[in-house]
């Protein structure tokens, strides 16, 4: 299959007190990934990320907490034939984190020892190794 286009998204690396990373699985999909999504018209990365965190997790991104971690590209997990390019930010959140909207499930994983679950290529190949290197 030929990869035809790239989807541009923002993604959040959220850690708990133990250093575990939050992953979510969207309804009707198999792969776990970072919370986040596509920018709406006129949004910058941080505004889009704050909106996505509110929509997906029901909590608020702490103002000024977004730390750019890099841009990464991989095969898209949920859109066959496409790639995803993500601007990844480490963020802090306020409030209780709970699946909302299209999120079916969320888990906290140790980036040094991720569980045997289906991971989005971007998460598996870039984000968890980045988080593990930062934690080691």
Regions found by a protein language model. Give the residues of each.
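Short connector loops at helix/strand junctions that flank enzyme active sites
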Residues: 7, 34, 63, 67, ...
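A short acidic/small-residue loop/turn micro-motif
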Residues: 29-30
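The catalytic Nudix box helix
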Residues: 35-69
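NUDIX/MutT-family hydrolases
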Residues: 88-90, 98-132
